Amino acid sequence: EGLEALFHSHKGEIAAVISQPYMHGNFADNRLPADGFWQKVRKLCTEQGALLIVDDVRAGFRLSLAGSDSYFGFEADLICFCKAIANGYNVSALCGKDFLKNTVSGISFTGSYWLSAVPFAAGIACLEKMKKLSLPDLLIAKGKRLTDGLTAAAQKHGYDLRASGVPSLFYLRIANDDNLLTHQRFISEMVRRGVYMTNHHNHFINYALSDADIDETVEIADEVLRLL
């Protein structure tokens, strides 16, 4: 409704709508889109002649190899990828529909690393391996195993530890902790014991994380939560 109102009050002035595939910011529970949300946005952008652009820099390849728009059942006009595309090498990509090619080709822009072959080779190899492994499904499963274990351990010790967002890119917080200090102590003690976690940011699951790593993480969390 808010987007409809903006289009109505700025008719013919909005060139594009750009958004993350779901709300995965910091210091707040992540929020998935309601059923039908993106389909309505897609329809509205099409009717108003505005491009629909997805910022998939963080969530890209963690939900679907075809892009997060595919995961949520709609088609973006442009998608921005980075980070996971080459396993840490400096590569980013802007993917779009064919009808935009002529427009893009008319824009002059330069870059410093276009002839850097190693990142492109890394990107190709990484994408091929992700496809072979059906990686998003594995990452989501690993993330769910981890978050289920952590929340169960917390519940045992009287803490409401909440995991939100997609399990491959989850956000974690102790809900019954009004001043955030308990959560920060929890994370600090986890790091002290060799488990690198972050206070108020998303946790990015990777393929190298094994079931044994997850079990050890949950065991350490159980110990820390008992001592808090």
Task: Pin down the residues of each PLM region.
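Conserved N-terminal phosphate-binding loop of PLP-dependent enzymes in the Aspartate aminotransferase
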Residues: 1-228
